[in-house]
């Protein structure tokens, strides 16, 4: 997992509420455990028509949105069934962060554990971002994870919440297992100093 510090990129707005994980990545793509190639399935039913041809009316197929790295999505993004393939598909497509007024909890957890930053903002900021994109699809914003702020084109900084442990992992590019392995020396020292009479689950 790559460390995340500051993300500066163009936004693309998908102002649809209750986008579920099946809309993000159809179930037929869940048969694979390899992350490569999942970008093809991202928003498949919207990006392609019945013949598999790109839908020119869908926002991600517009020439001016190519290369955007920050998705601005409607409330309750990622609802529905839990599927880790959803953040994998978003990352594979090139998105580094998703901004929304509210995320489904399971999706948010899956995304953060896979290095996809989820940024929850108030409704006013969300609407402003959508309007900015409608006016200029090349709009760029900056997300500073350390400061927990989104800086808009007018210079206004908007705070977003994130728990300290997740923030630490993202800043250092480690997942939960990586964090645990980094603390191996401290764990060994604790176990060595632990009184033998204390109950343990370790095998004798």
From Swiss-Prot:
| UniProt-listed SUPFAM superfamilies | LeuD/IlvD-like
Give the reaction(s) catalysed: (2R,3S)-3-isopropylmalate = (2S)-2-isopropylmalate
Q: Which EC class is the enzyme in? A: lyase
**GO CC annotation: what is one?**
3-isopropylmalate dehydratase complex
Q: Does the keyword Amino-acid biosynthesis apply?
A: yes
Q: What's a GO biological-process term for it?
A: L-leucine biosynthetic process
Similarity comment? Belongs to the LeuD family. LeuD type 1 subfamily.
Task: Give the record's subunit note.
Answer: Heterodimer of LeuC and LeuD.
- What HAMAP family does the record tag this protein with? LeuD_type1
What's the protein here called? 3-isopropylmalate dehydratase small subunit
Q: Which organism is it from?
A: Roseiflexus sp. (strain RS-1)
